[in-house]
Every structure is written in structure tokens, then in C-alpha cells.
Amino acid sequence: MFDAYLIKDGSFQNYEENGETAGFKVDVHIGEYRGCFLSLVRGYYVEVDGVEYPLETQKFEINNKAPRTFEEIAKAAWEHWDYDDYATLYVACPGGLAKGKHRLCLMQGLMTQYGWQAHDQEWIDNTPLPREMAGKQQEVYYFDVEI
């Protein structure tokens, strides 16, 4: 719904762990005006300059807690992501990305929060990849960013 606002301008950058550049990060906004419980956030489809970064490379930081995997986020049933808040999406990429301009392709994987559907238990047991979810966001969005 608010796809033009999915990332915070100027937030795309490399990050370090233990003195080494470990990957890149970007501040993300929820594309749902009501916000949602974190357990419904199932990760992101992330591609930069034609390279896809799978769910296993991603961590999510929100609500003043350390970055967590989306397996951990799936258990945060009582923790909410409010529309006004940005979260930080970390993507492991040893050495980070080169300085300069990049093309970021992004899609949020959000489960629907409007009551129980027949497919919901299957999605909980075998969550589809973010790009394969039939949730709120159906398209990949493209952003020109710079480190």
C-alpha cells in the first residue's frame, strides 16, 4: 500500500561485525498502514545488482532489540511493528558492497492478518519464500541507492 516508502532514504550502507565488513543494511518501513505483529513478517526478497540474497542471509532489528533471524521473528507473536517505526534489515555479504550506485530490488513477505484462512496452517508449517507469498505485497519494488 505504501510501497514508495518501503525504505528510508540514505539508510543503505555496509555494516561491520568484529571489525570486518559483514554485509549491507537498509532501514525498512512496513507497507501496511496498521502495522502488524512481528510473527507475520516472514522476511524479504532481496536482490542487489542482479544478485539475490536468500532469507538465510537476512536479520531484522526492531523495537530496540538485537538483530534476529526471521525464524526468531516468527515467534514474536506479541511484539508489534507500528507503521511509524523503521526496522533495519541486515543482509550478510562478506566484504559488503562496493561504494557507488546500486539497484535494490525488495519485496516484503507479510502474512495476512485478517482472520484464519484455509492455507494458514500450511504457511505456518512450511512458510513460502517472501517472493512466493500471496500476501499484501505482490510486486518487487526497485530502488536506486548509493553507498
Specify the residue positions occupied by each region the protein language model found.
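Terminal leader/tail segments of proteins
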Residues: M1-I147
